[in-house]
Regions:
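An N-terminal amphipathic alpha-helical segment
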Residues: 1-42
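Amphipathic alpha-helical interaction segments
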Residues: 43-44, 60
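Short phosphate-binding/catalytic loops that engage adenosine nucleotides
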Residues: 57
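Short, aromatic/basic amphipathic alpha-helical patches
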Residues: 45-54
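Sterically constrained small-residue positions within well-ordered secondary structures
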Residues: 25-27, 50, 68-70
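C-terminal edge-of-domain segments
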Residues: 60-81
Length: 81
């Protein structure tokens, strides 16, 4: 599964990351915070949460609004060992 990381600039394209890369980063540090772009489907992000919960991690997921526009949001995912 490929997910798009949050954009660093409004005009830039989001970078992608795979589930395997996320898992590797979490294994190295024990816990990690990821910010995902709004272009990701909610279903894919729920699959990510479920995947790590099944592996025994605590996962916190929320939508973060950063502006007044309806489309000004990103997804925040905390994965804790």
């Amino acid at each position: 599964m490929e997910l798009k990381l949050a954009r660093e600039d409004l005009n830039s394209k989001p970078k992608t990351i795979t589930l395997e890369q996320i898992e590797e980063m979490v294994k190295k540090s024990g816990d990690k915070i990821f910010y995902f772009d709004r272009e990701n489907s909610h279903k894919d992000l729920m699959e990510l949460v479920e995947y790590f919960e099944n592996k025994g991690y605590s996962v916190y997921f929320r939508e973060v609004k950063y502006g007044l526009d309806e489309n000004d949001y990103i997804y925040e995912v905390h994965i804790l060992a």
